[in-house]
Curated annotation (Swiss-Prot):
Function statement: Cell division factor that enhances FtsZ-ring assembly. Directly interacts with FtsZ and promotes bundling of FtsZ protofilaments, with a reduction in FtsZ GTPase activity.
Family per similarity comment: Belongs to the ZapD family.
Gene name of the encoded protein: zapD
Protein name: Cell division protein ZapD
Subcellular location: Cytoplasm
Subunit structure, as described in the record: Interacts with FtsZ.
InterPro entries xrefs: ZapD, ZapD_C, ZapD_sf
Lineage: Bacteria, Pseudomonadati, Pseudomonadota, Gammaproteobacteria, Vibrionales
An example Gene Ontology biological process: division septum assembly
Amino acid sequence: MITHKFEHPLNEKTRIYLRVESLLRQLHLSSAFSDAQQYQLFFRSIFDLIEIFEQIQLKSELAKDIEKQRVTYKSWLDVEGVDQEMLTSLLNDISHIYRELMQAERFGQSLKEDRFLSAIRQRFNLPGGSCCFDLPALHYWLHLPLDKRVRDAETWMDSLQPLYEALTLWLKLTRETGHFKDQIARTGFFQSDADEANILRLSIPMQYGAYPMISGHKNRFAIKFMSFETGQACTQDIEFELAICS
């Protein structure tokens, strides 16, 4: 059975985390500059990240969440039935990533101070603003040898490595708290309690031709399935899998 998967955040902080994860993924995928257009995705991802960093103290928020996870997992030490070797290894990983995070610069600081990035950032977001007459510095950079451009990209991405590792860990551990369970949306509608959840994960069979519209918060949520063909609410029962992740 072919399915499609959705994730939905149940609070604003997690919403930002998922956006940053998506931007970091785009950044890594486009950093090889294997075709002439990848640089647009690469720089747009960098500038979108800088904008997020300017709006929220992401480093301090993420540090608090990583520490909260460490305290939770530490409480499982010496608990019967828990793999203590695996738990100790995980706690060591969390502690290492937390230390690296706390020692890192404010997210995006070196990117904002980079002369080349600063020179192209403002005009890059203009419609069609990446033309050579709008951004001659970018046009010159694009004609540098590929290995030079890749080295520059690696330098910019290296400054985000503590963020990447910490965010990847937090989201991984958060997702692992939820287990997919079979559910039925009667006449295309489903609602339930969430109990301090951060993320909903859905797996939906493609055969229904439907996608979810989700609303809610950390304690309660509702899912309304919409027909892709008509844009109207589904009236049929829809079987799907749901994981509620805390």
